[in-house]
Amino acid sequence: MKEIFDFNSNIKKNLLYLFIGGAILTIIGLYQVINSGHGHEEVSEAVGAYSSGDGHSEFHWYHRLYSNLWINVVYFLGISISAIFFVAIQYVSQAGWSSGILRVPLAIGRWLLPGSVLMLVVFAITNHDVFHWTHEYLYDKSDPRYDYVIDGKKAYLNLPFFLGRMVFFLGIWYLFYALILKHVAREDKLGGTESWQKLFTISTVFVVFYAFTQSVAAWDWVLSIDTHWFSTMFGWYVFASWWVSALALITYIIIILRDNGYLTFVNHSVLHDLGKYVFAFSVFWTYIW
């Protein structure tokens, strides 16, 4: 059974309205940040506290813009890679119930490439304002702003190694995604079990690779924003937030498609299974909050 989504002018118009509304709200938010003296003082105190009270940093309105932009880039890229992880889990577990809905998480995974490019661009623009450890004076013992804690992490937290990890993780993740897409299309075209066996192998390797690299990515992209603080549970926390968000998005899109006449073969049992997924990992996320 073949279904083709009709991306008609009405849908495009509604998306345009949402985009315009988001842009207006962003402008209003920036205006409030720029012109709110009370908020300025509060954030200045927070930044001062973060800088160990030595006045290392001075708050500017664009710091809040940069930090929110970075976290959103990380969040939506995390949803994208988690959707791919969902597909891999289905092949590794040899699940049959989800075979009719895998096109949805595969489509969400398409954000991985543009999201990766956007992440590199945003990091290039915002790294000194978001990541305190990128300032060279923190490693100079003759400078009064020297930070022995951050200097002790220099072997790991340095720009070449950080960027190398970022490019490596994003590149290998996309490679796995491209391989999964290739063999899914091949399976649809040729049938049989050869492509399925390859998908099983690729997905197994990807799940193992992702289990390690996702935690390291969480340390790099989120935890290192506050270099003095650490948590042994942080990788799990970020995984849970990405994973449950991806599950919720997958479920939401499937419901919307069914309500508009698509995915008619998806029955209530499938929706019930997705609901159990979302509920279970919402509880898990709450537990490690």
Model-derived segments and their meaning:
Residues 1-79, 150-157:
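N-terminal regions that are enriched for targeting/export leaders
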Residues 3-20, 67, 71, 99-117, ...:
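Alpha-helical transmembrane segments and their helix-start/interface "positive-inside/aromatic belt" motifs
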Residues 15-16, 26, 43, 153-289:
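Long, contiguous internal "core" modules enriched in hydrophobic/ aromatic residues
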Residues 20-27, 109-129, 280-289:
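Hydrophobic alpha-helical membrane-insertion segments
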Residues 33-45, 73-189, 203-206:
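Transmembrane-helix bundle segments that line or gate the permeation/cavity pathway
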Residues 59-60, 86-88, 262-269:
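Short, charged/polar, low-complexity loop and linker segments
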Residues 64, 68, 80-83, 87, ...:
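Generic signal for short, ordered secondary-structure residues
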